[in-house]
């Protein structure tokens, strides 16, 4: 299973990629008002070298209670990718290290007992049309 997870606290952002059971992560401190450069984060975990976004099975982000803006930015970025690729996106409520986040995302997704319950974990929806 291939999982991509992102967390941000506003002044520290991390990205983690799980390919089967191997985890590759990158974390960086930045000014609170700076928007993360997502291309740079993806490049640092091997995007277009060891994986492509279309190969990801599950996207996850941390719902960080310390920075609602950081959570909205992260969720919006991953939601756009997940919708475009028709892949699941889940939110993790715990305050975890980035490596732990990707592990918990996998466990949460796989622990769903049936397809209906898995669908309830997916936090993406199609945009409404007028």
Predicted regions and their residues:
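Phosphate/pyrophosphate-binding loops at sites that engage ATP/ADP/AMP, CoA/4′-phosphopantetheine
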Residues: 42-57
């Amino acid at each position: 299973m291939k999982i991509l997870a992102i967390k941000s606290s506003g002044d520290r952002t991390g990205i983690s990629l799980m390919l089967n059971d191997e985890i590759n992560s990158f974390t960086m401190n930045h000014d609170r008002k700076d928007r993360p450069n997502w291309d740079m984060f993806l490049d640092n975990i091997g995007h277009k070298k060891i994986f492509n976004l279309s190969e990801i099975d599950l996207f996850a982000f941390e719902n960080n209670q310390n920075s609602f803006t950081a959570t909205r930015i992260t969720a919006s970025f991953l939601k756009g990718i997940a919708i475009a690729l028709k892949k699941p996106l889940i939110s993790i409520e715990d305050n975890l290290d980035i490596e732990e986040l990707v592990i918990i995302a996998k466990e949460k997704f796989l622990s769903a007992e049936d397809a209906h319950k898995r669908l309830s974990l997916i936090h993406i929806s199609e945009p409404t049309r007028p």
